[in-house]
Amino acid sequence: SPANYATAIQIRERAQQEIDQLSDAQYAYLLEQLIDQHLPIRFDMQLASDYLQMSERHLRRSLLLEGISFQQIRQTVLERKAKQMLKNNLSIGDISQALGFSEVREFRRAFKRWTGQAPSVYKNGTE
């Protein structure tokens, strides 16, 4: 109906205004939340820009102004989740799968790159 259409347009415009008012720091925070909520899906820059209804270029520039990249945000989320899961005694295989890694080996390599130690060493150090 025309009334529903008008309401939908108003909601869309209001959402766009809120997105436009976000500061760069809020973009980073929002991206952290989106990446976390969509695990184990690999929430990439294209999905993020589609979700935020902006171009990848605009999102990339907004993050650049803050001095952070999408990849850094994604890595921060994955590292934080991995550490949390290791502390909760989840298996490395389960963690790897929950974070969207295709292989355990890939997760182990990423974790070592992030922290400087293997997941098993980190897990034993937190017990």
Where are these regions (language model features)?
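Extended mid-to-C-terminal alpha-helical interaction segments
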Residues: S1-E127
